[in-house]
Structures are given as structure tokens and as C-alpha cells.
Amino acid sequence: MDKRTLAIAILILALALSTTYALLNWRTEPECISSPDQSWSSESESQNPGDLGSQTPNQEILPEGNQRQTQPIEEQSKPPTPKNLTVVDSTGENITVNLPVRSIVSLNHGMTEVICALGCEQLLIGRSASCNFPPSVLDKPVMGSSSYSPNVELIVESKPDLLVADTMLSYNKEVYNKLRDAGITVIVEINNSTRIKKFIEYMGIILNRTERAKVLLDFINYYELLVVNRVKGIPDELKPRVYSEWAATAWRSYGPGSAGHLMIVTAGGLNIASETEKAYPTLSPEFVAEKNPDVILIMLPGELKGSIEGFVSTRDEVLARPALTGTRAVETGKVYVYDPIIYQGIRYPVGLLYFAKWFHPELFKDIDPGQVHSELIRQFFGVSLEGIYVYPP
């Protein structure tokens, strides 16, 4: 073998070893335990992470075009020191979490998805009935129907290091106090765009998954900024008037201070309920007809999830309302029914993209929200997206 051939062989061997090492590093993850003692408060930053367009430590300026830059997920290799971490949850409570956290009960589906997306599903020892994704969590014991109605006895008996729930738990003071009196660390959060990024950030610290949390936050921030950058500068006279309705009650809408209102405004729409005094006002049919919305958004009722028939029947009921028959939204067919999961938790940017494309289709011709949804599910859960989430598609 001559020197030139030998040199080429050595180079090929070096490249093979380098590739193998990189793949091993990608696949090898540390134990899901907590990071060293530190104090972290959601009030420590000057801007609320839910303030769309604000820069966070994990946020990057969009690259040219629409290609989102991805990066490998690498975790800390240094063993953490198990002490404690203090966070401020959505109720304003200072919550001290003893570290390491080795067992969690989650009573909210969005928070369960965050924990699993961070690669810590093995820490879940219980869930509420609504926590049904990823499919593998269905093997976890059910410890209540919701955050409002947990099985206190079962949870206390299981002795979790941490319990996460949505604000419905704080409304049930008796149950909330029983759990805390039993010595269980309870974090109450809001599962929407106003708080989800904070939850991801501090759960990344608690679970020693800061790098994975950064990748997840980068995904959310990328698409959030994409929408913000494309709709900024649109004058109000070119923005569609939007009527958005809750699933629970006809004519109940979203006013200032609600996540639904924030979604509409961020996506480049004008909320017809923006001048109401309540966050969740009930509007009169006459008021909606007078505002003559260009787009109507209807949340799919929970009991109708899982089939196209539920979407179709919900839309048909809205189209048949006498007060709406003469509105531009009905006349142009811009009445959309959506599963609320698309704007909750880590799926929030998916809902934002759907809203933006419905409001300004000409600005988002190159964006397929369904494809983004599929990418998110594949990248962070390793499964394929199934089901129906919007109608018409």
C-alpha cells in the first residue's frame, strides 16, 4: 500500500469514528434528575415570556427564509447536586422544589406533554384522565378526572416528589390545601401561551433537561416570531374582524386579558370583543351581527373530539344561526372549528399558525400548520401525528 492510499484510509477511518462518536452522544442521555441548587423566579425577567415578540434567553432571530435551524440535543454530563429550586408559579406562590425530583403526578395534559417532550416520561407515576398523549402515558395510573377533581387519597399514598396542575386546582381550595398539608410540593400553572414558556424553562432546570428545554423553546419561538414578523405593520383597516367562541356556551367569547384574545391579536386579527370589560364575556347575537366578523372561530366541544362528524356538526350549527347568516364570515365560508389542543402547551405555535393563515392566507401561502404540527410531534415524541384538529382543513 503506497503512502497516498494509506493516508486516505486513515482519513476515512477517522471520519467513521467521529460519526460514531457523534451518534453515541446524540442517543446517550443522562438520568432525568435535577440540577444544582439555585433560586429561579418567573418574575426575575423584565418581560413576561408570554409577551409575544419579547426576546428571551432562548430566542434567536429568524434566519433568512423559512428554514428553521435545528440542533442536536446534548445534556449536562456533570452529575447534579440534589438540593432545591424556588420558582414562582402562576398563582404567585413561591414554590420550593426539593431536588432531585424522581416522581411526578401530572393533572394537566399540556404539562404532561412538556414533561414527556423533555425526555422524562419515566418520572410520571400518575396522571389525570385527560392526560392521554403521548400514547405511552396511558399505562400510567389515573389519579383523578382533572386538576379540579384529583384523587387525593391515591396521590398522597403514591408520595410524589412533585405534583403539577392547572389553575382549576387552585379553585378547589379544600383539595389544594389537603395536598399541600400532606407535604406534597404542588406547582399550579396556566397551560397556554401566557405561561407555557416559563413552565418549560423552569421544568428544564428542575429535571436537568436545560438543553432539551432550549431546543423546545427555540421551536416555539421560531414560529411565534415568524408570525409576528409577517403581520407587523399591517394597518387595522386591513386586519380581519374576528369572532371567537368558547365550546361550552354559545356566544361566550374572549376579551382582553384572555389567551384567546392574545392569540387573535398576535395572529394579525381584530377581536370584536376587545372593548368588553371581562376576559370571557358573553356577547349578544345582535352585538356579533352588528360587528359583522370577517372570520369566525369556534372551539370544538370536548365530547365531540375524535371524529370529523363532531367538527362538521359544530360548524353547521354556527352557520345556521340567524344572527350570523348575513355576516361576511358565513357568506365567504370563513368559519373554522378547531380542537383547543392546538393552542395549548407546546402546541401553541401550531394554533397561532392556523389563526394567522386563516386571517392572512396570502402572507402564509408557504406555511402548512399541519406539517409543523407533525414535525413537532415527531421531533419531541417520536411518534406520528394522528387525528383531526381543524375543520375545514
For the regions a language model picked out, list residue spans one by one.
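His/Asp/Glu-enriched short active-site or ligand-binding loop at hydrolase and phosphoryl-transfer sites
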Residues: 128, 257-280, 300, 332-336
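Bacterial Sec-exported substrate-binding components of ABC uptake systems
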Residues: 2-112, 211-244, 364-393
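A short, structured surface patch at a secondary-structure boundary
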Residues: 102-158, 162-170, 272
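Short helices/loops that flank or line small-molecule/ion binding pockets
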Residues: 150-160, 181-182, 283-292
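Solvent-exposed loop/turn segments at secondary-structure junctions
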Residues: 110-113, 130-133, 148, 162-172, ...
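Extracytoplasmic substrate-binding proteins
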Residues: 83-84, 94-96, 103, 173-252, ...
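A local structural motif
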Residues: 96-98, 135-142, 213, 267-277
